[in-house]
Amino acid sequence: AAVPSGASTGVYEALELRFRAPVEPY
């Protein structure tokens, strides 16, 4: 999981784990 330039790190981490998609949040 890439490190998003924001404070919503846990949110993107959860989404990546749930959907299992190689999505890179910006």
Curated annotation (Swiss-Prot):
Disulfide connectivity for this sequence is none
Domain of life of the organism in this record? Eukaryota
Question: What is a GO molecular function of this protein?
Answer: metal ion binding
Q: Which UniProt keywords apply?
A: Cytoplasm, Glycolysis, Lyase, Magnesium, Metal-binding
The pathway noted for it is: Carbohydrate degradation; glycolysis; pyruvate from D-glyceraldehyde 3-phosphate: step 4/5
A biological process (GO) annotation for this entry? glycolytic process
- Relay the cofactor remark from the entry: Mg(2+) is required for catalysis and for stabilizing the dimer.
The protein's annotated catalytic reaction(s) are: (2R)-2-phosphoglycerate = phosphoenolpyruvate + H2O
Q: What is its EC number?
A: 4.2.1.11
Extract one GO cellular component term from the record.
cytoplasm
Per its UniProt record, the required cofactor names are: Mg(2+)
Q: Which family does the record claim for this protein? A: Belongs to the enolase family.
Q: How does it assemble?
A: Homodimer.
Q: What is this protein called?
A: Enolase
Protein species of origin: Populus euphratica
